[in-house]
């Protein structure tokens, strides 16, 4: 079953956003090579410029967990933890399909 992952990052004012965006792009490229990766999209909020959102879809939860514990991915996560204004938001969702008409 497909798993959707939602990530929300809110950076402090002094964070280097260009560096952060570069790391997001690097992680997106690395994710594309991971087993079970289907797609992702990311960007800055149109409402709050210090907020970034990442949404991705994976074939299964095992693939998400493997990706989350990939060494380079963990290294980048830890690099930015001190630069969050708010707690990092991480949610997982399963897809919903309309039941057939009965």
List PLM regions with ranges.
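Short S/T/G/P-rich N-terminal loop/turn motif that feeds into the first structured element of a domain
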Residues: 1-51, 59-69, 85-102
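Short, flexible helix/strand-to-coil boundary loops that buttress conserved ligand/catalytic motifs
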Residues: 68, 77-80
């Amino acid at each position: 079953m497909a798993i959707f992952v939602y990530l929300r990052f809110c950076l402090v004012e002094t964070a280097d956003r260009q560096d952060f965006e570069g790391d997001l792009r690097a992680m997106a490229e690395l994710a594309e090579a991971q087993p079970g990766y289907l797609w992702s999209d990311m960007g800055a909020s149109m409402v709050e410029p210090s907020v970034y959102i990442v949404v991705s879809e994976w074939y299964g939860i095992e693939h998400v967990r493997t990706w989350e514990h990939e060494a380079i991915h963990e290294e980048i996560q830890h690099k930015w933890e001190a630069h969050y204004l708010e707690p990092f938001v991480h949610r997982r969702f399963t897809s919903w399909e309309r039941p057939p008409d009965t």
